């Protein structure tokens, strides 16, 4: 039985890629030096896979930024405004991802969206009338040859044409028909080139197949591959799917001339039933995704073997991961502070390679010692249940999830209490974390800085941050979050039930890596988490300072969740803990409390029929539970970013927050139309500039954005803010950008008042 994975993490076990890229962006190393780091990371990945017994090591899973962006470059799908910059290929890629600004040019970054239901983000391809598909697969071919030279016969992977078409933005009436023929031609060129190099396999990733499909989309997929597979010659082609099942098109797909089909048996709820009902062709390999590529818990071998047995008499099975391993950390080997007893329950990417091999060994060779060892792990009670917490959740009633008075009624109380101008200006929460801030936090963690000295340092930074905001002229201030390393980890560290790693980093986008905490047991709040800093900040200014919290859904979605209880139960545990913090902030005199739900959309099922019963019916009430007991005059804010929210606007309104800020700048404010169409009641702050790009927007640019918003929404409903927190930016970008934001807002206010007179 062969062993396979879909892809391996590219950031390196110590984030080597992140640090090399940041040096390159600062012009501290050359492209050649950057490429050396990349080559070392690829070699390490292939070695790890081969040593673990993987029969099909993967190539072209490496990327300097994003695999969808790599495909756009390979297909020549580069908008003219980026071509005019006359940059080399690598710097063009970075301009698309990050924007580009110099004395002569000022080009915004392309929009960034969540990759299906994960916390990874992709750069959205743009198709216009000017788009001309031109195949240049040198990256894929070079990396395949690089592996071959190093002694590894790899299976290159690439996102497929169907998923590319589904994910792309189409401008000015253009449809996929405009580029379809050339797109198929480009992949045909790749087939020929890989054949000429002696390539054995090509993996084509088509995750868009697990979304709800229309009849037209099913026909589009069949049309593409009936044409494309005629040209495969000796090359074997694997259709790889993940994040769900193929219930809309399985019967048609298995008739196509693929040599292998990869199915997800972890998130694909219907995958086993589809194979049982319609069979699986004997002339193809079934790449069975049975090792979870998205969570860090050990595989339960007995359950996996039972699943494989349920597939029936299929001889041609390859043991595979359910999705790319880029969604989990690289290895547990670096976790020297966690006990062996705890680590035994975890499998990061390298450990999942071993799991794939062991499942194959048990299945084929009936290796009972491996199976017995795994069974012993699951036979023990890992954690003790918190009976008191369970009873608290059981006794929740409908009243616990409803805030009174209503949104409209309490708005009058808030206007009176806060006395804010039209178009109130604010930021999303965090301010730039300078090397000085990170150094002090590290010294405190290591015991090199006393608690009193560290707190004095933080108080000084908060004062500076407040003074900066007052000088700029912002209306609602934040304390800057200098005490926080990460918006989830910071809370997890103060909640019982979480455990933490040292180096379990996962790529979120580009150079941005996150270290998700792990939900180990039942979650409770032993003491206040943020009150100390919010209360101190409010004591330093007469302007309102927002209390800053992360919401329960986001905390869970950006953690590695338990698999022994439901996501709903874990979320309600978190909601009760955050509710306690909200009420403590209110008691401390904080009049505006922001409860971020940046990741609300993330775990939304990919199929619309599952949205409510599987997710929204409990995730939205969990948010309401957090703030249901506050006073009418306390204003509740929330923030959401980098997802498509247009189709769940009624559910977002049902969160019953008083103000919601959205990412909107990269997506050309498209969400505004959806808000208007759904008669959205909540006050809104659509982000007026993109903080994920280093470019500085002019006040005129922000003014134009504001005017676009006010053409569609009443001025009384609008707040003005950037589209996300400022932690990852520098002061040299943040200060002028916020200054321009306030200047633009004041101009629009002045014009509005003059017009009204």
From Swiss-Prot:
Cofactor: Zn(2+)
Pathway(s) it belongs to: Amino-acid biosynthesis; L-methionine biosynthesis via de novo pathway; L-methionine from L-homocysteine (MetE route): step 1/1
Origin superkingdom: Bacteria
Catalytic residues in the record: 692
Residues the entry annotates as binding L-homocysteine: 428-430, 481, 596
Annotated cofactor note: Binds 1 zinc ion per subunit.
Family per similarity comment: Belongs to the vitamin-B12 independent methionine synthase family.
Record protein name field: 5-methyltetrahydropteroyltriglutamate--homocysteine methyltransferase
The encoding gene: metE
């Amino acid at each position: 039985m062969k062993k396979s994975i879909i892809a391996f993490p590219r950031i390196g076990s110590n984030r080597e890629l992140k640090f090399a890229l940041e040096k390159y962006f600062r012009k501290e190393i050359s492209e050649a030096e950057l490429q050396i780091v990349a080559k070392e990371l690829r070699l390490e990945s292939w070695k790890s896979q081969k040593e673990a017994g993987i029969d099909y090591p993967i190539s072209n899973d490496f990327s300097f930024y994003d695999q969808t962006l790599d495909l756009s470059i390979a297909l020549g799908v580069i908008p003219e405004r980026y071509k005019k910059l006359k940059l080399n290929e690598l710097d063009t890629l970075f301009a698309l991802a990050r924007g580009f600004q110099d004395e002569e040019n000022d080009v915004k970054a392309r929009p960034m969206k969540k990759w299906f239901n994960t916390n990874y983000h992709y750069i959205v391809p743009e198709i216009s009338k000017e788009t001309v598909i031109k195949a240049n697969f040198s990256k894929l071919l070079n990396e395949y040859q690089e592996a071959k030279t190093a002694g590894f016969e790899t299976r290159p992977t690439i996102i497929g044409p169907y998923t590319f078409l589904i994910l792309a933005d189409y401008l000015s009436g253009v449809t996929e028909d405009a580029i379809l023929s050339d797109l198929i031609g480009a992949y045909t060129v790749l087939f020929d080139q890989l054949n000429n190099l002696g390539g054995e396999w090509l993996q084509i990733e088509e995750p868009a197949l697990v979304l709800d499909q229309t009849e037209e989309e099913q026909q589009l997929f069949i049309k593409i591959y009936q044409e494309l597979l005629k040209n495969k010659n000796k090359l074997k082609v694997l259709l790889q799917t993940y994040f769900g099942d193929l219930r809309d098109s399985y019967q048609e797909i298995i008739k196509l001339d693929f040599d292998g089909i990869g199915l997800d048996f972890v998130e694909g709820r219907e995958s086993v039933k589809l194979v049982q009902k319609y069979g699986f062709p004997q002339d193809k390999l079934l790449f069975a995704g049975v090792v979870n590529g998205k969570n860090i818990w050990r595989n339960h071998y007995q359950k996996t073997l039972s699943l494989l047995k349920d597939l029936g008499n299929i001889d041609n099975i390859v043991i595979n991961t359910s999705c790319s391993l880029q969604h989990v950390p690289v290895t547990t080997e670096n976790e020297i502070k966690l006990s062996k007893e705890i680590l035994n329950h975890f499998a990061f990417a390298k450990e999942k390679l071993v799991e794939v091999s062991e499942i194959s060994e048990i299945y084929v060779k009936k290796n009972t010692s491996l199976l017995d060892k795994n069974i012993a792990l699951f036979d023990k009670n890992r954690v003790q249940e918190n009976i008191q917490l369970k009873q608290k959740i059981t006794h929740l009633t409908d009243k616990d999830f409803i805030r009174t008075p209503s949104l409209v009624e309490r708005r009058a109380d808030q206007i009176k209490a806060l006395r804010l101008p039209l178009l109130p200006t604010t930021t999303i929460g965090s301010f730039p974390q300078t090397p000085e801030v990170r150094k002090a936090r590290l010294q405190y963690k290591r015991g090199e800085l006393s608690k009193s000295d560290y707190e004095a340092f933080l108080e000084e930074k908060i004062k500076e941050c407040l003074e900066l905001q007052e000088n700029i002229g912002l209306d609602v201030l934040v304390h800057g979050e200098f005490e926080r390393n990460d918006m989830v980890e910071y809370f997890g560290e103060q909640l019982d039930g979480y455990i933490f790693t040292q180096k379990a980093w996962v790529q979120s986008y580009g150079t941005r890596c996150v270290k998700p905490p792990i939900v180990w047991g039942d979650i409770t709040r032993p003491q206040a988490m943020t009150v100390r800093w919010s209360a101190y900040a409010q004591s330093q200014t007469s302007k309102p300072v927002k209390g800053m919290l992360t919401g329960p859904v986001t905390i869970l979605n950006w953690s590695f969740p338990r698999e022994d209880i439901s996501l709903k139960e874990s979320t309600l545990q978190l909601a009760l803990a955050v509710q306690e913090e909200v009420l403590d902030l209110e008691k401390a005199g904080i009049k505006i409390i922001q409860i971020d739900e940046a990741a609300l959309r993330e775990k939304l099922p990919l199929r619309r029929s599952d949205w409510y019963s599987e997710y929204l019916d409990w995730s939205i009430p969990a948010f309401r539970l957090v703030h249901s007991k506050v006073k009418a005059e306390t204003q509740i804010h929330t923030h959401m970013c980098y997802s498509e929210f247009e189709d769940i606007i009624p559910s977002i309104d049902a969160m019953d927050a008083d103000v919601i800020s959205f990412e909107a700048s990269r997506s050309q404010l498209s969400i505004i139309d959806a808000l208007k169409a759904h008669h959205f009641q909540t006050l809104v702050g659509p982000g007026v500039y993109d903080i994920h790009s280093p470019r500085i927007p002019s006040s005129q640019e922000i003014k134009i954005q504001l005017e676009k918003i006010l053409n569609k929404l009443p001025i009384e409903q609008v707040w003005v803010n950037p589209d996300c927190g400022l932690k990852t930016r520098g002061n040299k970008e943040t200060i002028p950008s916020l200054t321009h934001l306030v200047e633009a807002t004041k101009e629009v206010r002045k014009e509005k008042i003059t017009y009204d007179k």
